[in-house]
Amino acid sequence: MANRQTEEKITALYERLSRDDDLTGDSNSILNQKRYLESYAAQRGYTNIVHYTDDGWSGGNFDRPAWKRLVADIEAGKVAHLLCKDLSRIGRNYLQTGFYTEVMFRQNGVHFVAVANNIDSEEQNSGEFAPFLNIMN
């Protein structure tokens, strides 16, 4: 019998900063997003961290390189958890963002957390305001 090495699923940390976001100052910087998400993941014991970073990309454009790589990894069953700072990091088009958060992530068994919005797909009531927040993005 051949030995099969099981691959541990990853905890994906997604960071995005558009040129317009950069004007808001340091709080949304890529480095700050990474630190924020790494701290959250460590506090919860999430391991096998992989960063997906789109620096300089608009949230209205879902044809972002790191985003496309992340979606491919989700579809390939490689992702257990997906963390982002807030829903606006996923995207600014509420219909597309809603498709990912409400349909695609669930269908692929991905635990999704938008930390600053207190949205956690494993918490029963945490996503009640997600559609409203999504529209506001």
Where are these regions (language model features)?
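Short, structured surface patches at the beginning of a domain
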Residues: M1-N137
